[in-house]
């Protein structure tokens, strides 16, 4: 993990699978609340790296907001685990509708 600008931290998750591009995790650490942009895939390895980043920055998940840029699983995969720890997640309503429409297409 490195601080790329004051209070903005970046961790890159690389994969051995050449078909998977690296994932960048960003956290903006604030005094009262912190902001994470996207999460990553829902894998144990990604969770360990992401949780390690949060812990290293001394962030309480109850004071963490997550902004989801779009509905792909490599951006949303770890949201449920973070919500279980008290984090709040936000996503553009258009992306939320896409996710619901996608779910409905699978159920139709």
Label each residue range with its predicted role:
Residues 2-57:
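Conserved beta-strand hairpin/beta-sheet module of binuclear metal-dependent hydrolase folds
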Residues 55-108:
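Active-site HxH/HxHxD metal-binding segment of metal-dependent hydrolases
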